[in-house]
Amino acid sequence: MNILIFGPNGSGKGTQGELIQKAFGITHIESGVIFREHISKGTELGKQAKSYIDKGELVPDDITIPMILETLQIKGKSGWLLDGFPRNITQAQKLHEAMLKKGVKLDYVIEITLPREVAKSRIIGRRICKTNNNHPNNVSIDSIKPDGNNCRVCHGELIVRTDDQDEEAINKRHDIYYNTKTGTLSAAHYFKNLSDQYETHYILVNGQNTIEEIRKTLLEDLGISSEVS
């Protein structure tokens, strides 16, 4: 099973990705991690990517896509969920073309929808548990509100990421994501428009539901009961 997942920052995309990974035993692959791994290992693609990153420039698609495909084929032999790529319509088209050439089948595309202002509020309200950063805490979401100043799961210390409070940075990220002409949503919709032709199932889920409600919907749409995961 091979899956692309889309959702704005603040939608809980990462949390749902981890839950899907555990339920299906597939590999959760994040584009940012791929860059870091290639750079730390000193691969040829990693060296090329680093030369752009060090200059504060975007890594070209002709470096990024081979890097991602290589990771999918090596780490995702039993299935994968790709998170964080593609980010725009051009990348979607190039990724699709590359997957066709390599014979890589895309089975599902997940889009978690969330109004922009709600997504922004959630980012600002996010709190990170120092003991375990997989423990969800958010002052803007009733179902996962912290226990005062402590983690709702383990009562550990909570911290606030400075970039979560930078409204200008949040707005820039969301400008890219919510752009339906050339941005990340246009990439998601590119695959949606091809879903019938390539037998790819497109799943739309309401990100304003609780983590458990979203999980239940996704697992059922992906073909298993949430009771057995």
Swiss-Prot record:
Region annotated LID, chain positions:
125-164
What enzyme category does the UniProt record give? transferase
Where does it reside?
Cytoplasm
Reaction it catalyzes: AMP + ATP = 2 ADP
Chain segments carrying region NMP: 30-59
Which one Pfam family would you cite for this protein? ADK
For this entry, list what GO says about its biological process: AMP salvage
Its keywords, alphabetically, are: ATP-binding, Cytoplasm, Kinase, Nucleotide biosynthesis, Nucleotide-binding, Transferase
* EC number(s) given by UniProt: 2.7.4.3
The residues that hold AMP are 31, 36, 57-59, 84-87, 91, 161, 173
Q: Specify which residues bind ATP according to the UniProt entry for this protein.
A: 10-15, 126, 209
Q: Which GO terms describe its cellular component?
A: cytoplasm
What InterPro entries does the entry give?
Answer: Adenyl_kin_sub, Adenylat/UMP-CMP_kin, Adenylat_kinase_CS, P-loop_NTPase
Q: Which GO terms describe its molecular function?
A: adenylate kinase activity; ATP binding
Q: How does it assemble?
A: Monomer.
What does it do?
Catalyzes the reversible transfer of the terminal phosphate group between ATP and AMP. Plays an important role in cellular energy homeostasis and in adenine nucleotide metabolism.
Q: Which family does it belong to?
A: Belongs to the adenylate kinase family.
Domain comment in the entry: Consists of three domains, a large central CORE domain and two small peripheral domains, NMPbind and LID, which undergo movements during catalysis. The LID domain closes over the site of phosphoryl transfer upon ATP binding. Assembling and dissambling the active center during each catalytic cycle provides an effective means to prevent ATP hydrolysis.
Its name, as the record gives it, is Adenylate kinase
Give the source species: Lawsonia intracellularis (strain PHE/MN1-00)
Query: What gene is this protein a product of?
Result: adk
